[in-house]
């Protein structure tokens, strides 16, 4: 399967999705979103894929929405575009496979919002982050006003959203937006090292851990702990649980399906 604006590579249980529109700094237009939606469906359906990595081609991760395409849109057209992007981003956030952002450059607007949808976030030291929508007279359209406060707290999020200021990778790391910052030449090596570590673990257990964490972030702990209990119990008797326990008793590395 091939796409115009997305490159897809699968190797050793890791799918790498690369935004491939460098002439526009990988800006998100309707065609990119359509390609992204299709490629995400592909990796979700592929049982051989255990981890999904997102990165960008060239000097940009995603430079935001395509302002040229949006210029002249009516309110209804803007709503349709926002709903499409929001739906794809939510699909990525909820997919049962762990996702890693490898931010190689600019992550502005929708690019920053995309990063917030992923599970683990790496960036090179030259990466920049910005939500500039208020400088354009608009509001973030891919749920940045919702995810950023949950990530770093309301007060810090409001400062970033109200000012439209630029964040360095070091800033984003300090705020808790990023997990790791690397030198540019080391970015993908470090991303793949972690992806490989995750891929070696039980895919079924990881999918349930992710579901439990996602569910618990929006509910009382007394409800969330029952969800966790149900997921934990569901693991027992599965091939991965049997293999995991056997490997522990036999003092060897587990070989999960």
Each predicted region: which residue ranges?
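Glycine- (often His-adjacent) and acidic-residue-rich active-site loop
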Residues: 48, 56-91, 107, 220
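C-terminal long alpha-helix characteristic of the crotonase
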Residues: 22, 122-127, 178-226, 230-239, ...
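A general structural signal for well-ordered alpha-helical segments in protein cores
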Residues: 33, 67, 85, 89, ...
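CoA-thioester-processing core
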Residues: 87-96, 102, 108-162, 175, ...
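Conserved CoA-thioester-binding segment of acyl-CoA-metabolizing enzymes
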Residues: 1-57, 90, 246
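Well-ordered beta-strand positions
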Residues: 120, 159, 163-165, 171, ...
């Amino acid at each position: 399967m091939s796409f115009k604006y997305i490159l897809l590579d699968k190797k050793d249980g890791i799918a790498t999705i690369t935004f491939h529109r460098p002439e526009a700094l990988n800006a998100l237009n309707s065609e990119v979103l359509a390609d992204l939606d299709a490629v995400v469906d592909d990796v979700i359906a592929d049982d051989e894929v255990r981890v999904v990595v997102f990165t960008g081609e060239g000097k940009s991760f995603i430079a935001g929405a395509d302002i040229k395409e949006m210029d002249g849109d009516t309110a209804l057209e803007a709503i349709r575009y926002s709903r499409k992007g929001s739906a794809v981003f939510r699909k990525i956030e909820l997919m049962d496979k762990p996702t890693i952002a490898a931010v190689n450059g600019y992550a502005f607007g929708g690019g920053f919002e995309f990063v917030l949808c992923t599970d683990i976030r790496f960036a090179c030291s030259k990466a920049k982050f910005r939500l500039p929508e208020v400088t354009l007279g608009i509001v973030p359209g891919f749920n940045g006003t919702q995810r950023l406060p949950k990530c770093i707290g309301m007060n810090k999020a409001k400062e970033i959203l109200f000012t439209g200021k630029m964040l360095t990778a070091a800033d984003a790391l300090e705020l808790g937006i990023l997990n790791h910052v690397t030198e540019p030449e080391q970015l993908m090596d470090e991303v793949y090292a972690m992806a490989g570590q995750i891929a070696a673990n039980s895919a079924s257990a990881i999918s349930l851990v992710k579901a439990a964490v996602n569910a618990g972030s929006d509910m009382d702990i007394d409800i969330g702990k029952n969800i966790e209990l149900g997921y934990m119990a569901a693991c027992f008797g599965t091939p991965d649980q049997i293999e995991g326990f056997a490997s522990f008793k036999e003092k060897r590395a587990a070989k999960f399906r």
